[in-house]
């Protein structure tokens, strides 16, 4: 299948035995590195406009998390071979394995969206000095704000067995997000590209496991890592940050944006009343040149 606007050649790396991650490595090998991390239920396709707008000068690294996009989608049953546990810590470890493989030990720009924030800032806990610039879009690096209720659409998948069945049977989360996660309707071919990797029950495993891994309390497996990321977030206030936010997002809404503003008061912010969760779909014509200008104003 071809994907509109995605004229790139993915590469593959076994991040653990028998489990391969698909990723992009676009742009000059000696260019300033921009690591772009997607969330759920998207994949690296989310970043295509930014890759196209930066890769003449910048080295763009764009992984598809395991179970997502063009990466392998292993089972997590106890007897599965190979087996993957679909936890936040495993996502962080996978990212570290990829960047080690690519020899990226110098300064980077960390660009994040959705779960990409928790993965990226989780990785940054042990690579703080490498992260020199931040590009933050509709994401989190701290627990659910107390004033923010969990959207029922997310709670359904996280808490209810019926929700898991519905998501895995009908691709409800990926398909729904392609309609409801934008303010400007996606062209049909773009919408198909977003949902194509999740074309059967087996291939939808990660879209539900991400939801079930959302840390809401200390009893949850990912809580400790997220809490440490939250504690470390203000320590990034000494370096350039760019925040782009779609204010119509039902999940990562104004409460999450406010959390980032408090932690990173130096950040340049572009918040859009008429943009949604996939802010790079709704506003890529504005954001791609704005992000490039931000990088050029703040060279590594």
Swiss-Prot record:
Cytoplasm keyword on record: yes
Top-level taxon: Bacteria
Residue intervals of the AB hydrolase-1 domain: 33-282
Localization terms from the record: Cytoplasm
Record-level GO cellular component terms: cytoplasm; membrane
UniProt entry keywords in alphabetical sequence: Cytoplasm, Lyase
SUPFAM superfamilies (UniProt xref): alpha/beta-Hydrolases
One Pfam match: Abhydrolase_1
Reaction equations catalysed: a cis-3-alkyl-4-alkyloxetan-2-one = a cis-alkene + CO2
Enzyme category, top tier: lyase
Function: Involved in olefin biosynthesis. Catalyzes the elimination of carbon dioxide from beta-lactones to form the final olefin product.
Family of this protein: Belongs to the AB hydrolase superfamily.
Subunit and interaction comment: Homotetramer. Forms a complex with OleC and OleD.
Name assigned to this protein: Cis-3-alkyl-4-alkyloxetan-2-one decarboxylase
Gene name linked to the record: oleB
